[in-house]
Amino acid sequence: MKKQQICILGSTGSIGTQALDVIEQHPDRYEAYCLTANNRVDELAAQARKFNPAAVVIANEAHYDRLKQLLADMPDIKVYAGADALCQIVEAGPIDMVLTAMVGFSGLAPTIHAIKARKKICLANKETLVVAGELVCRLAAENRVPILPVDSEHSAIFQSIVGEGDNPIEKILLTASGGPFRKFTLDQMRDVTAADALKHPTWAMGAKITIDSASMMNKGFEVIEAKWLFGVPADKIQVLVHPQSIVHSAVQFCDGAVKAQLGVPDMRLPIQYAFSFPDRLPLNGDRLDLFKQPLEFFEPDLEKFRCLALAFESIKRGGNMPCIVNAANEVVNEGFRKGRCSFLGMGEIIEKTMAKATFSATPDYDTYIATDAEARRIAAELMALA
């Protein structure tokens, strides 16, 4: 069997490191062709030594010399730097699939290049579909490129519709853990810190997504992602708070039947399924024990979790509005982590940015680039005044 050559965009992050664990468990099937990182140069070099890829890319060019130096005794590994190098490397002939595990808007350009080069996409960068879902899905259809979801929720939805053909979907049930502040009052939420928000009850993730999970903006983004991936309007996507994170999501069909995917919270499972689909491969790890705990479901409180309501609002408005929300969110998320913005202030600044940024009903790629820059500037200015 020919080994599948995988390019991991963002190999030093939470998803990237777990993807390498999957590759390590199946060395007969998968090989890391290219590994990339933004700033974590030492980790990238260590991964390169272990997995011996054909190439590595460090997006931040300031780290290029350091990476070259760290890998000086491994001349077979080509070393590149810069955002353009990311877009070029995904087009490399030997690559079979690209795992987009970078965080934020920066994942959009390399994903588009990979689609145009007809590489199978294992999508973990949800911002790509939040910002430019229409464009990305159209390009994927034109190039006949499969997009396989890596988010645990979207993988669960995907697994629930496998074998269903054209059977109509009545509703998608998108589960959310509720994050660390699920039981907090609005008053209590005024004073929470980044350290409080980074203590996620069920998932171990990167810092940016952990804050998005605490504000429930992450779930709002996942609604947008589900809309594009599965062609289901947002009013047919119901968010359920499910603190145990065992039911990863479910699909209700036209006859009222509901199919769900359950499992322990382990991101390696959706990563591996995206790699191996339609096959299932063995995976070492914990197994689900349904006797351990009850499964609970609650309605989300949209007053407390304003960010989730704003995401739904952005879908309703359409056009470049989700792009505006994403850009503002990236700014306030980082601001909150650095103590420049309060937890509830994040939603307030995003809402004001939505009102101030230039709206476009029919955006193209250049519009998204301009919108992203404008919304970031507005959000940063609002944050400085707050």
Residue ranges and their predicted role:
Residues 1-386:
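Catalytic, metal-anchored helix/loop core of enzyme active sites in primary metabolism
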